[in-house]
């Protein structure tokens, strides 16, 4: 009886373990979305980029932003910054 109980518990734990691992399929990489604007990133560049994305894109796109990065860029003696925000899924990526 003790062996039968141990076997049932072992099978149940293996079932839980296998289902947990199976559910972890390939995670899709975040989808980058970028833009350029005048001025420098400043001390809080990611927030600046997020605000610019809010102005440029609709709420459905903005809701899927996970994080943003900002890089200063100087061209033709004009300060600019480049923003890249990463989306969980959806527009402009079509990976579902």
UniProtKB/Swiss-Prot annotation:
Disulfide bonds: 31-93, 41-70, 49-83, 68-85
Cellular compartment(s): Secreted
Keywords, sorted A to Z: Antimicrobial, Disulfide bond, Fungicide, Plant defense, Secreted, Signal
Entries under InterPro entries matching the protein: SCRL
Top-level division of the source organism's lineage: Eukaryota
Residues annotated as signal peptide: 1-23
GO BP term (any one): signal transduction
Keyword Cell membrane found: no
Name of one Pfam family that matches: SCRL
GO CC annotations, alphabetized: extracellular region
Family listed: Belongs to the DEFL family.
Name this protein carries in UniProt: Putative defensin-like protein 236
Organism: Arabidopsis thaliana (Mouse-ear cress)
Name of the coding gene: SCRL20
């Amino acid at each position: 009886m003790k062996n039968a109980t141990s076997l049932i518990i072992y099978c149940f734990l293996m079932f839980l373990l296998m289902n947990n691992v199976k559910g972890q399929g390939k995670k899709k990489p975040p989808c980058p979305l970028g833009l350029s604007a005048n001025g420098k990133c400043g001390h809080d560049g990611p927030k600046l980029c997020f605000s610019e994305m809010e102005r440029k894109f609709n709420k459905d796109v903005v809701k899927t932003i996970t994080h943003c990065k900002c890089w200063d860029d100087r061209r033709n003696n004009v300060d600019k910054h480049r923003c890249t925000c990463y989306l969980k899924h959806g527009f402009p990526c079509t990976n579902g």
